[in-house]
Amino acid sequence: MSRLSRLQRQVLSLYRELLRAGRGKPGAEARVRAEFRQHASLPRSDVLRIEYLYRRGRRQLQLLRSGHATAMGTFVRPRGPTEEPVDATAPGNRLDDSDALKNPCEGTGARETRSDGR
């Protein structure tokens, strides 16, 4: 087996720390395992994404270690037995130009900034 890189060692260390911090908190260990398993297939060359996920994991670890976290879970909308996944590109699901906002600030109450900064 080849020697692990520094980033790989950090990720494995984070995994162990998250599992330890999640002991005794309902759903935490399963959530940690599922999250790491989901991203295990990331290519080693995708360093930016790996570093982003590492930083996100560090923040979650801090939350777990703080006394405020009592459990860990996810927000998942279960699909019904006959419900199909929605395909945004299907002809019946396409937004026409009249439905789309013309300006990203439209509808937010934010003022539009002119290109000269005023």
Curated annotation (Swiss-Prot):
| Family stated for the protein in its record | Belongs to the complex I LYR family. SDHAF1 subfamily.
Q: Where is the composition biased (Basic and acidic residues)?
A: 109-118
Region feature Disordered, mapped onto this chain = 72-118
- Where does this chain carry the motif LYR motif 1? 14-16
GO cellular component terms, alphabetically, are:
mitochondrial matrix; mitochondrion; nucleoplasm
Taxonomically, what lineage is the organism? Eukaryota, Metazoa, Chordata, Craniata, Vertebrata
For this UniProt record, give its keywords in alphabetical order, as a comma-separated list: Chaperone, Mitochondrion, Repeat
Output the CDD domains linked to this UniProt entry: Complex1_LYR_SDHAF1_LYRM8 (cd20268)
**The protein, known as:** Succinate dehydrogenase assembly factor 1, mitochondrial
Motif placement: LYR motif 2 = 53-55
